[in-house]
A protein has these predicted regions:
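Structured alpha/beta reader/binder surfaces that contact nucleic acids or chromatin modification marks
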Residues: 1-148
């Protein structure tokens, strides 16, 4: 099965259906099922990087993301280094001004929708519980495991 490694909390937001697009600097011709792998990168490091990039307070970013999981402290408990779900990749959209204008604000907050990047569009998101430990890779890769 094809797999894609995504940093937390975005991996869990995708498989829970709170996020429909994963943004990348590159396009893919692949369409079909993809295992969603949560990277080993600690969530706190990702939040700190996001806060610095957006010139915001780390706490503001943390509170906003925590609220999406509906319970305080949930971010620190997200699985890493594991397959957390699967989804169907249906489209790979070039990000343009027109494309951005059609997105809801929450979606824009959950990715880098810079002009010229690509928004991978997912449907039929299914979380896996418990997550399946796996080593990730960069790019679109083949996972030898099974979610059946």
């Amino acid at each position: 099965m094809k797999a894609l490694t995504i940093w937390q909390p975005w991996a869990s937001l995708l498989v829970s259906g709170q996020k429909k697009y994963e943004t990348r600097s590159w396009a893919t011709a692949y369409r079909g099922p993809i295992a969603i792998h949560a990277a080993m990168r600690p969530v706190r490091r990702t939040i700190d990087a996001l806060a610095a990039d957006r010139e915001g307070s780390g706490w503001d970013v943390l509170e906003r993301l925590d609220s999406l999981f509906l319970r305080p402290g949930a971010l620190d408990q997200l699985p890493t280094g594991a397959i957390v779900g699967k989804a169907i990749l249906t489209r790979c959209n070039l990000i343009t001004e027109d494309f951005r204008a059609k997105l809801p604000p929450q979606e824009l907050d959950l990715g880098d929708f810079s002009i010229g990047r690509y928004a991978w569009e997912f449907h039929v998101m299914v979380p896996v519980d418990p997550p399946v430990k796996a080593s990730g890779k960069q790019g679109l890769w083949t996972w030898e495991g099974s979610l059946e």
